[in-house]
Regions:
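Surface-exposed coil loops of outer-membrane beta-barrel proteins
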Residues: 1-62, 106-112, 190
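Sequence/structural signature of outer-membrane beta-barrel proteins
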Residues: 8-12, 41-54, 84-90, 109-115, ...
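Residues that define the transmembrane beta-barrel architecture of outer-membrane proteins
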Residues: 18-22, 59-63, 122-126, 156-162, ...
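Residue-level signature of outer-membrane beta-barrel architecture
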Residues: 28-30, 69-71, 132, 168-170, ...
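Repeated loop/turn-to-beta-strand initiation elements of outer-membrane beta-barrel proteins
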Residues: 32-38, 63, 69-79, 87-90, ...
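Transmembrane beta-barrel strands of outer-membrane/channel proteins
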Residues: 38-42, 79-83, 142-146, 164, ...
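Outer-membrane beta-barrel translocator/channel fold
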Residues: 83-101, 179-201
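Outer-membrane beta-barrel "beta-signal"
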Residues: 166, 238-250
Length: 250
């Protein structure tokens, strides 16, 4: 259920980003309405690495179970469960980093939500995603995600994220899409006291984009992104980002 936004956060539920790379997957259709996806993923730079805490089964991995309900031609939603494990990525200044390891996290959200606190991390993540087309020119979509981080031998933390968007298919030209998105990038809302304090403030991600189909093979997407309370700190000034993405298909 990936989207058309420019930012990584806007593309899909961040819980899918805990790991990515080399994967083995099974896709099964019970009928036209219900689909089951199972997957096992290992970062590409780890899969063929013979060193300890690497390879297919001795290092970073992520397993996925997802069920998708295609209610009609205009609506679908999915429920996801992800189990992930990451050896220590060395983001604790008191621990010597291991550069052979893939960093922990979703690559979006606050620094705390992507910190391993210098220990191996086991993650159990749960997600919901849905999209509903209200008319040929208007669709709404969104997701929510929760993850429990177990910092092995050190403590636990809880991460939350969500987003909602309006999409305008064929806006201005067939094949083009406009969109407006608002959401909360991954935020660590709970953290065991021996590890410190969780993120103190809520930060919002607002994004507007327009994917314009120049030709059947070339798409240009200008976008503007507004981040409030960067890194979950209301004392930080808001950030506004402009971006242009061009995609060539051959």
């Amino acid at each position: 259920m990936d989207g058309n936004a420019v930012s990584l956060f806007g593309l899909r539920n961040p819980i899918y980003n805990y790991n990515a790379g080399t994967d083995l997957g099974i896709r099964h259709f019970f009928n036209d309405q219900i689909e089951l996806n199972l997957g096992y993923l290992v970062p590409s730079n780890n899969a063929s690495n013979p060193f300890p805490q690497n390879g297919l089964f001795d290092g970073t991995y992520s397993s996925l179970a997802q069920i998708i309900f295609n209610l009609s031609d205009t609506s679908r939603f999915g429920l996801s469960y992800i189990n992930s494990y990451s050896p220590s990525g060395g983001d604790d200044p008191d621990v010597e980093p291991n550069t052979e390891l893939t960093p922990f996290g979703t690559s979006t959200g606050s620094n705390l939500s992507n910190s391993s606190f210098g220990s191996p991390v086991s993650v159990n993540a749960y997600g919901f995603s849905g999209t509903f087309r209200l008319s040929p020119g208007l669709a709404i979509s969104g997701w929510a995600g929760y993850a429990n981080h177990r910092y092995i031998a050190r403590g636990d933390g809880s991460m939350w994220t969500w987003a909602a968007s309006l999409n305008f298919p064929d806006l201005g030209k067939e094949g083009s899409v406009g969109g407006i998105l608002v959401g909360m990038e991954p935020r660590l809302t709970q953290l065991d006291s021996n590890l410190g304090s969780p993120d103190r403030d809520t930060s919002l991600h607002l994004e507007a984009f327009y994917k314009y189909a120049l030709t059947d093979n070339i798409q240009v997407t200008p976008a503007i992104i507004w981040l409030t309370a960067p890194d979950r700190n209301a004392d930080n000034d808001d950030i506004i980002i402009g971006a242009i993405r061009t995609v060539f298909r051959f």
